[in-house]
């Protein structure tokens, strides 16, 4: 029996490699109970050893299987990419075309190269497998479909491969507090999804998208994440946002302020029409400054705002600011920020609804290798979420009767929180229409003759639903994001078709549906051709009565005539009288 016991111990020792313990057991004599206890212990150790080996073998097998799948997926993608490559004949054709261009002696300026990249970007808007956020995405075809569905084009002068859009908020590499601020949003809008990867990577970006597309959150989240990553002084302006109007500046401030709740960051808004001294005091120790060009420049020149450490600069609605004559103010403001071309660390972001020549020139001057991201078209276009209805009125005096009928119908059938926005052309007209409607409806007005406090109060009453009807001039037509505007009524047609698109863009925002009704009279016939084009592009029904005014479209005009002429203007000469 003792011999058998020693043989068993020897067998176990070979399995568990514990020579010291086995030697000790062999030295024991006749203590049978101790032998039995030890044998039980060794048997359990033996079973654990076998189980561990089985687990290791299963894990090794799983790793080998995963490796095979990765190789198959990579091979499949390389085959797909190879099929997408252009044939050599196309390359030769492009090469010959380039040679012809070079013979003509045309030199490309930096401004022109941005536009060329934009055209090329529309052709190469394919997601890059080697991009920074590619590891978070498993279904490449889903991203291809998303890009095609929203007509997203990229133009990156530094790379032909584009970063994949961020389709869900949980893919955002930002702090938990910032992500918490997005809980009221369902999913990123196309401009947010496409620009976030580049902005979070620190690239300069030009974002072109229609009104109501969520551009404020698009530049706001990366701006606040940039601040969270700073370890040094945050009590000086680090983020600067320039807005064209007071209302848009206030709205941007409210949106950003809601995102920084619970943090130690401070944001302020500055604009004309309010006491400058109070705004100067509020700007102290603020890390985020939002303001209009004129008031910002005043406070910078006074020394109340120091922009020498601004690392994130945003020009919101850049085309509107240039249209309204703020170009020189913008250039002066930017000159007070760090220059990235001279080892400065400023990240610059332009957001605009269009891509006119003036915005291109400004971008070429102040942005460093910008990525141009376009949602839809470079040209101004109405959202297809808006149902456009054009009412042809032969007699302009019938406007008030039709307006009364529309309000009665929509206020009785609409939802409790639904709002109606009425646009007119002139300030006196706004006051008259407001006074007429106030006899029957709960209505407020907003126009240029009102004080800033009265305008803000009227806007707040409209936003809160206290007054469901707002009569406004075009001062409220650009950039304002007023929730649940179900109906826009253009009582008077605007001066330009661009203003028309911005007016109706107050409804149908952020993937919601809306309706815009426009009164069109013979006095507006010069806009008939442009209006037909807007309706056709948005796939809307075109009333037959509109064609009687003609469909010709005049050449594009600017504020100074029918041609864009760059006339050099000499500096003013100071006259000194003896």
UniProtKB/Swiss-Prot annotation:
What is a biological process (GO) this protein takes part in?
rRNA processing
Q: Which UniProt keywords apply?
A: ATP-binding, Helicase, Hydrolase, Nucleotide-binding, Nucleus, Ribosome biogenesis, RNA-binding, rRNA processing
Q: Which residues bind ATP?
A: 209-216
Give the reaction(s) catalysed.
Answer: ATP + H2O = ADP + phosphate + H(+)
E.C. designation(s): 3.6.4.13
Biased composition regions of type Basic and acidic residues, renumbered to the chain: 59-69, 86-95
Where is the sequence biased in composition, kind Basic residues?
70-85, 96-107
Region forming the signal peptide? none
* Pfam families, alphabetized: DEAD, Helicase_C
Q: Where is this motif: Q motif?
A: 167-193
What this protein is reported to do is described as: ATP-dependent RNA helicase required for 60S ribosomal subunit synthesis. Involved in efficient pre-rRNA processing, predominantly at site A3, which is necessary for the normal formation of 25S and 5.8S rRNAs.
What's in the domain note? Answer: The Q motif is unique to and characteristic of the DEAD box family of RNA helicases and controls ATP binding and hydrolysis.
Name of the protein described by the UniProt record? ATP-dependent RNA helicase dbp3
Which organism was this protein described from? Schizosaccharomyces pombe (strain 972 / ATCC 24843)
Q: Which gene encodes it?
A: dbp3
């Amino acid at each position: 029996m003792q011999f058998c016991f020693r043989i068993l111990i020897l067998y176990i020792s070979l399995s568990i490699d514990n020579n010291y313990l086995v030697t000790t057991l062999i030295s024991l004599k006749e203590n049978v109970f101790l032998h039995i206890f030890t044998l039980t212990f060794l048997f359990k150790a033996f079973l654990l050893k076998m189980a561990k080996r089985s687990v290791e073998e299963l894990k090794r097998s799983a790793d080998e299987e995963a490796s095979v799948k990765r190789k198959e997926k990579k091979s499949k993608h390389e085959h797909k990419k190879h099929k997408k490559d252009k044939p050599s004949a196309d390359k030769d054709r492009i090469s010959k075309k380039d040679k012809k261009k070079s013979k003509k002696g045309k030199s490309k300026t930096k401004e022109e190269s941005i536009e060329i990249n934009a055209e090329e970007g529309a052709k190469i808007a394919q997601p890059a497998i080697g991009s920074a956020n590619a590891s978070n995405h498993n279904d490449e075809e889903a991203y291809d479909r998303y890009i095609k569905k929203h007509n997203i084009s990229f133009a990156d002068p530094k790379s032909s491969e584009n970063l994949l859009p961020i389709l869900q908020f949980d893919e955002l590499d930002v702090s938990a507090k910032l992500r918490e601020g997005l809980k009221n949003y369902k999913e990123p809008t196309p401009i947010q999804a496409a620009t976030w990867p580049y902005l979070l990577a620190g690239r300069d970006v030009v974002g072109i998208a229609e009104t109501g597309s969520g551009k404020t959150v698009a530049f706001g989240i990366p701006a606040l994440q940039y601040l969270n990553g700073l370890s040094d002084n945050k009590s000086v302006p680090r983020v600067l946002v320039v807005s064209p109007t007071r209302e848009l500046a206030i709205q941007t401030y409210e949106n950003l302020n809601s995102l920084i709740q619970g943090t130690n960051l401070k944001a302020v808004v500055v604009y004309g029409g309010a006491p400058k001294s109070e705004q100067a005091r509020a700007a102290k120790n603020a890390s985020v400054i939002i303001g209009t060009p004129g008031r910002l420049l005043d406070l910078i020149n006074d020394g109340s705002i120091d922009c020498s450490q601004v690392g994130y600069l945003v020009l919101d609605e850049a085309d509107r600011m240039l249209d309204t004559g703020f170009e020189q103010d913008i250039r002066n403001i930017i000159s007070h920020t760090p220059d990235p071309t001279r080892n400065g660390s400023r990240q610059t972001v332009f957001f605009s609804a269009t891509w006119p020549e003036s915005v291109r020139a400004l971008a070429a001057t102040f942005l460093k290798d910008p990525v141009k991201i376009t949602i839809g078209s470079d040209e101004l276009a109405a959202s297809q979420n808006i149902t456009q209805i054009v009412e042809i009125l032969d007699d302009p005096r019938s406007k008030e009767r039709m307006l009364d009928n529309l309000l009665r119908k929509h206020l009785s059938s609409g939802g409790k929180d639904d709002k109606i926005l009425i646009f007119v052309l002139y300030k006196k007209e706004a006051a008259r229409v407001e006074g007429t409607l106030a006899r029957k409806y709960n209505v407020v007005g907003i126009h240029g003759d009102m004080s800033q406090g009265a305008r803000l109060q009227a806007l707040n009453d409209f936003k809160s639903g206290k007054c469901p009807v707002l009569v406004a001039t075009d001062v409220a037509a650009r950039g304002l994001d007023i929730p649940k505007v179900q109906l826009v009524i253009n009582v008077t047609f605007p001066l330009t078709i661009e203003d028309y698109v911005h007016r109706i863009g107050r409804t149908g925002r952020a993937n919601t549906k809306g309706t815009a009704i426009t009164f069109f009279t013979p006095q507006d016939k010069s806009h008939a051709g442009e209006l037909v084009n807007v309706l056709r592009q948005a796939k809307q029904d075109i009333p037959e009565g509109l064609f009687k005014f003609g469909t010709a479209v005049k050449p594009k005009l600017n504020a100074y005539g029918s041609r864009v002429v760059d006339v050099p203007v000499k500096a003013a000469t100071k006259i000194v009288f003896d």
